[in-house]
């Protein structure tokens, strides 16, 4: 198990495609921190910045699209055994109904909201086409800004 930064960077370089797959998975779930760290590693040469942005963009888009589909297909009924989460989902859905355009651009940043937002978009009245278009644009902005923030932080810390 690698214990210092140089060893971690070497592992990333040796297992490049697997490392990109790992970042894709985290971008699809909800890890802002992992993408920031990957941007940091890109500045140090372990990842290609452009490829990393694309992987994060597609991962973020795909993760929210899957959550949207689940919300659209199953609603919130499948959460009936988790009443607290179901309440949080309905609160998030109310935000989506009133502020769907702004919310789709901002939901990726605060901790805890992203996990539920895709489902909330799915149970909202937002059309599939509107969601997919706005989600695609939002995921791209998120990927560029988050990877770049990690990249430039690494540049500043040199």
Residue spans for each PLM region:
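Transmembrane alpha-helix interface/packing and boundary motifs in multi-pass membrane proteins
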Residues: 17-36, 107
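Transmembrane alpha-helical core residues of multi-pass small-molecule transporters
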Residues: 26, 59, 137-142
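Membrane-helix interface motif
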Residues: 137, 145, 149-156
